[in-house]
């Protein structure tokens, strides 16, 4: 599932991670890193994808909770991609419109996602964070509040 597998995998991974090392200043440097793949929808909730969004919100809660509980040995962060790959039931036209409707007028590409991963790999003081790599889609999501329906 979107929640159970990451929960179990994080628990098992944490059992195997060595103790945190120390940097030159004597401060701990985590020896493990967990990256959960969320969805930018956790920043802009919509009832249109209720069960999926609830599962991803649970994973976001797990990310933050595990970041506290596994520190300082393991850092836990998340990436929230926007429209990156076309869904199997999604038309070319719909996917193109979805990407164009973001604030930046583009979706993300796999290289954008790996760049976000690279950031987390090289940022030892970052834990419990969500990096939305979505072309700003979470800022422009057409939810009822944006449409003036609530």
What are these model-derived regions, one by one?
Residues 110-133, 138-139:
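C-terminal substrate-recognition "lid" of short-chain dehydrogenase/reductases
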Residues 1-6, 10, 47, 55, ...:
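Short alpha-helix in the Rossmann-fold core of NAD(P)-dependent oxidoreductases
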Residues 10, 63-64, 114-117:
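Short-chain dehydrogenase/reductase
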Residues 60, 70-84, 126-133:
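Conserved Rossmann-fold SDR core element
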Residues 4, 15-71, 83, 137:
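Catalytic loop of short-chain dehydrogenase/reductase
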Residues 78-93, 142:
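Short beta-loop-alpha junction of Rossmann-like oxidoreductase domains
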């Amino acid at each position: 599932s979107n929640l159970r597998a990451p929960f179990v995998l994080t628990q098992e991974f944490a059992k195997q991670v060595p103790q945190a090392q120390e940097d030159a200043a004597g401060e701990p440097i985590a020896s493990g890193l967990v990256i959960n793949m969320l969805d930018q929808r956790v920043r802009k909730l919509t009832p249109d994808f209720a069960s999926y969004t609830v599962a991803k919100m649970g994973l976001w809660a797990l990310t933050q909770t595990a970041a506290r509980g596994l520190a300082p040995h393991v850092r836990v962060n998340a990436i929230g991609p926007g429209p990156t790959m076309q869904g199997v039931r999604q038309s070319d036209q719909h996917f193109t419109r979805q990407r164009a409707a973001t604030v930046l007028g583009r979706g993300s590409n796999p290289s954008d996602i790996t760049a976000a991963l690279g950031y987390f790999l090289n940022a030892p003081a970052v834990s419990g964070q969500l990096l939305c790599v979505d072309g700003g889609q979470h800022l422009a999501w057409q939810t009822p509040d944006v449409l003036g329906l609530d």
